[in-house]
C-alpha cells in the first residue's frame, strides 16, 4: 500500500478548543484581622510573678525548664453583629446586639468586608435578595483560617509531558502564599498560616490554572455569622439566618472535633515513630532503577523510576520531612491510600524513610491530568460518559468505605496513555464514622464546591457527586461555571443559584442533561449517589477508554506548540 493511501486513511485530528486556558487572576489584598492587644507591662509582670513566684532565683532555673510552656492565647472569636436595611439595601450595625448597654458602639460591617463587597460585583439587588448568603461568603472569604494551597509538586521541569501529572498529583505537603482564595490544613490540626517563599526558579513553561481554582481549606465554624435586623428603624425587615441543620448532636460534634484536633497534635518524634511503622525497611535504590527527575517543588522532588523486579514505571516523591509543616497530613494520606486500593484510583505502592527524606512510591500515569484534555480539546458525549463512569466507580468504592474525597475536579483526574482514568490527591479526604457521619469544614475548590459546603452546612459523600457534575460541565465547556466571575461573587452564586446554567444546553442530549441534573440537585436527598448514577442511561453511551488516547496526544501537542 502506498504512503499516500496511508495518509488518506488517517482519522481526523480531535477538535481543539479555540479559547486559551491561560487566564490572569489578580490577587485581592486582604486586610488581616488585628491581633489582640498585648496586656499592659505592669499587669503582665504581676501575672508572671503569680505564675512563677521564684522567677528571678537562679536555683529555680531547673524547675522552670521542667514547667510546661505557657502558650499564647489561640482560637480568638470576634463576633460581628450585622443588620440589613431592606429599604436602603445597606448592611448596618446591629442596634440590638450584645454590645448594647456596654458603652461600646455597635460594629456593623467591618471595613475590610465593605471593601471586598465593593469589588465583588455582587449587585445591590443580589445583596437585597439574599443578604445572609452575602455574609456567609464574606465570612469565609475573609476568614483568618483560610490558607492558600500551592499543590505539593509545582512543575518546574522542562519536560512538558509531566506537567499534568505533577500539577494534579500531590502528597499533602502544601506551600503557602496569598492569592484570592485559598487552603489546606487538616481537620485534625490547628490551622496556621505557612509563609514559605516560592522557589526562585523560572516559572513553568505552561501557565497554570488561575490562583482562584486551587483547592482551599477552612476549619469548621461553631457559630456562623448571624444576620440580625436593626431594631430602631421601622423601614427595616428582619432577616432570618439560613438553617444550619444544627441540633444538640451537631453542637456536640463541633465540640468533639475541636477536642480531637487539640489531642491530635503529635511531636516530630511521634510522627517519625508512626512513619517507621508504616514504611518498608530497606534501600529503595536497590529496588528501583533509571531515576529520572520530572518535577521540582518547594517541598520535594518527583522522579520516575523502574521497578527492577516487575519492570513497572512508577512515580517516586522524595520529601524532606524537615520542610513539611504538617507532617501529620502525610501520615493520614498514606494510610487512606494504603487502605483504599482500586483500579480507578492512583494507587499507593510503597514508602521508605531515607535519612531525613520520605520516599513515597505511586503509580505513574503518563497521560497527564484531565485538565489538559478539557482545556485543549473538545470531548464528545461518549468520551465524557466514559470518564464519568470511571470516576463514579472510584467514588462508589470510596463512599462504600466511608471516605469522602472532597476535591473532585479535572486537575485530580489522571490519565494513562491507554485512556485509563484514575482519581488522585487524597489530601482533603475525610473518613466518616458512625459518631461523625457528617462534615462541616469548608474544603475543596470554590468553583467545584457543593452549595452545602459553601454555606457550611453539615454534608456527606454527595458533595463529591456535585463536584463530579461540575467536572462534567468542565468537559463540555472547557471550564467550570462562574470561572470568570469575581471569586466572592462565584461563591455567592453557588450558594444561591442552585444548579448552574449551561452555556448551550440545546447542544446536549436529553439523557446527558438528566445526568447533570441528578448530579447537580440542590436537595441533597434527591441528588444521586455514586451507586445510583452508575445505573444512569447516560453511561450506557460511553465509548471505549481507548477513545481518549487521541485526545491525550492532541492535548500534549497543543501544549507543546503553545510553548514554542
Curated annotation (Swiss-Prot):
Q: What cofactor is this protein dependent on?
A: Mg(2+)
Which portions of the sequence form the region Disordered?
Answer: 1-70, 172-216, 229-267
Q: Where is the composition biased (Acidic residues)?
A: 186-201
Q: Which SUPFAM superfamilies match?
A: Protein kinase-like (PK-like) (SSF56112)
Stretches the record annotates as GTPase-binding: 65-123
Q: Which SMART domains match?
A: PBD, S_TKc
What does it catalyze?
A: L-seryl-[protein] + ATP = O-phospho-L-seryl-[protein] + ADP + H(+); L-threonyl-[protein] + ATP = O-phospho-L-threonyl-[protein] + ADP + H(+)
Autoregulatory region: region residues: 65-150
A Pfam family of the record is Pkinase
Q: Look up the signal peptide feature and give its range.
A: none
This chain belongs to which protein, by name?
A: Serine/threonine-protein kinase PAK 3
Query: What species is this protein from?
Result: Xenopus laevis
